[in-house]
Amino acid sequence: MTFIIAVVGATGNQGGSVARSLVQNPSFSVRAITRSPDSQASRSLLSAGAEVVKADGFNGEEMLAAFQGAWGAFVNLNSDDPIWRQPGGPTEFDLGKTIVDAAAGAGVKHLVFSSGPPCVEMTGGKVNMKAMEMKYKIEQYARKLGSFETLTPINPAWYLENFLAEEVAPIFGGFPYFPDEEGYLTFRVPHWAGPGGDNRVPFLGIRDDFGDIIHGIFLNPERYNGRVIHGVSQLRGFDELVADFEQVTGKKCRYEPVLPSWEAFDIHGIPELEDVKLMFAFTQTTGGRYFAPEPSEADTAAELKRTTAVALGKPEPEQHTLRTKDFFRKHFATEK
């Protein structure tokens, strides 16, 4: 017997990783739900073995039909969609509520939702990352609905793949592409936590690990019911991160903290980076805790990755979450 898992946001970074992992398991049948079934990303999923279904997340009837017969669902929403910045337009909560209601109405048993930390609650109202707060609000709505046998929120960490975006590297000091005037690849961002806090930063290999982590949840959804999963590959300090890059590439690197606080971080008026700046406000206020009031941990994600790898019959070296050093070796080393 195969179990249908619907993936909302299947053509994005998160959903694509989930779909690519799940299609490898004959116990699961992947249904990719998208507004653009003719896109290259949709065609790639189709070629990989997924079913591709057209549905608009704002259309409750279309989503209800798309979820019919699904045993499980993974849902991620695009917080960077320009539609959220339109005055008087819909909110991300509106979209999330419609999708969650449709999944519940179709009888989906197991929901995994890509959520965010309760930043307002965790900072006593000092910091409001709009995207994260909206996701958390949707998560709470889904919990209170009480229609799913299991509901597991996952909070994704800092994508390692962000370091592949050469165009934004200058905002972060030039690392890992553009040397400064002294010849260093300088990573210039605020401290993660500051003195006395946990300055280990959660990094995530979205392509290598995220889909396998979600896959692992669906292999045993009851075990992870209600738990906030920390979507992380490795916890690594900024100084350790640049040291890893230097060791792999042989290029001079350094980490220079933006001082005196997150407020001095210049994002050059780019709206999509406003929440990145506020992320540092958040973690400096919480002492480095990003996912929840509890300390960040990588063991659960590593366990889920291993569970998936074993289920797929992968060898031991492929059963571990990605290390930052291996990510840099894969993408930046001249000799791989």
From Swiss-Prot:
Binding of NADP(+), residues: 135
GO cellular component: nucleus
CDD domains assigned to the protein according to its UniProt record, in alphabetical order: NmrA_like_SDR_a
A Pfam family recorded for this sequence: NmrA
Reactions catalysed according to its record: 4-{[(2S,5S)-5-[(4-hydroxyphenyl)methyl]-2,5-dihydropyrazin-2-yl]methyl}phenol + 2 NADPH + 2 H(+) = (S,S)-2,5-di-(p-hydroxybenzyl)piperazine + 2 NADP(+)
Pathway(s) annotated for this protein in UniProt: Secondary metabolite biosynthesis
Record EC number: 1.5.1.-
Keywords carried by this UniProt record: NADP, Oxidoreductase
Transmembrane segment boundaries: none
Annotated function: NmrA-like family domain-containing oxidoreductase; part of the gene cluster that mediates the biosynthesis of the alkaloid (-)-FR901483, a potent immunosuppressant that shows efficacy in animal models and a probable inhibitor of purine nucleotide biosynthesis by targeting phosphoribosylpyrophosphate amidotransferase (PPAT). Within the pathway, FrzB catalyzes the reduction of 4-{[(2S,5S)-5-[(4-hydroxyphenyl)methyl]-2,5-dihydropyrazin-2-yl]methyl}phenol to produce the (S,S)-dityrosyl-piperazine intermediate.
Family per similarity comment: Belongs to the NmrA-type oxidoreductase family.
Stored PANTHER family: NITROGEN METABOLITE REPRESSION PROTEIN NMRA FAMILY MEMBER, NMRA LIKE REDOX SENSOR 1-RELATED
Name the record gives this protein: NmrA-like family domain-containing oxidoreductase FrzB
Gene: FrzB
